[in-house]
Amino acid sequence: MQHHKVAIIGAGAAGIGMAITLKDFGITDVIILEKGTVGHSFKHWPKSTRTITPSFTSNGFGMPDMNAISMDTSPAFTFNEEHISGETYAEYLQVVANHYELNIFENTVVTNISADDAYYTIATTTETYHADYIFVATGDYNFPKKPFKYGIHYSEIEDFDNFNKGQYVVIGGNESGFDAAYQLAKNGSDIALYTSTTGLNDPDADPSVRLSPYTRQRLGNVIKQGARIEMNVHYTVKDIDFNNGQYHISFDSGQSVHTPHEPILATGFDATKNPIVQQLFVTTNQDIKLTTHDESTRYPNIFMIGATVENDNAKLCYIYKFRARFAVLAHLLTQREGLPAKQEVIENYQKNQMYLDDYSCCEVSCTC
């Protein structure tokens, strides 16, 4: 039975980025447990899906590539692409993991975690591990919100090119909803999009709320080319039924529409459905309760990292946001372990805007 200082669950952007940062702070006894292979969720993106944040090798000027998980790497440099596919990003993660010689156990499913007096016992499908600290980096992509009996969730689509030309309904009015509408419309389909709210024209400057320029630009271009996309706002879906070869979508207003094709659900994800999250964290109404250290309120030395972290209304749903917490948490571990502070390392992360120790600084405000 292996005992390690740190166990990270999940070998995605957050898990690999955290492991690299821990090494920079002198914590090297780290393992990563991954149920599939490195970049598992990215490999399951629809083939046409791209990162909405652009990659550019701005490293060296205090602002690393927005999609980089470490200060000295850049997907733009490695792949010469600005908006990267899921498959390519997974390849980037593998390249980085190899470069930093991370200790990753693939095809290892965590089945249970129990607390002992001085450490945690992690049972998996391959072996049992002990760890003093646990970082949960499982994300939410494997837990789509599917509130209705019918509907294809965006995350379940392998390739939009497999859809025949026709009339489609998309439910959801943010990034994945508009991306689905764009992908189908550019192939000649007619799209009716229904949503209760949308970030399309939101005045909030925060890109976690407002539709990204990349999505907005693609949407505008395809509409200029004659695409037919009908947007319906303030519609809340109550139910979806299927009979007589038609999908019937009913809204809480009493209105309804029908479509011959199964509706596409761009309804987001729910990390609280993850059994690991349910076991280790207090959850209420799709919200994961965390301390100001992104630590579980149920167990000490168990942390949440990645896009699922929300703290003081700050949503860390982009890589450039959540990577800024890695060094803060690594520094916290050195303090708890009584290790000497690595001030040069801390300052280096601070200079590269990767040391977010105050969530009150996260408010996004633009005058024009």
From Swiss-Prot:
- Which cofactor does the UniProt annotation name? FAD
Question: Can you name one GO molecular function term for this protein?
Answer: monooxygenase activity
SUPFAM superfamilies cross-referenced by the UniProt entry: FAD/NAD(P)-binding domain
Q: Tell me which UniProt keywords the record has, alphabetically.
A: FAD, Flavoprotein, Monooxygenase, NADP, Oxidoreductase
What does the record give as EC number? 1.-.-.-
Outline what the protein does: FAD-binding protein that may have monooxygenase activity using NADPH and/or NADH as an electron donor.
- What is the protein's given name? Putative flavoprotein monooxygenase
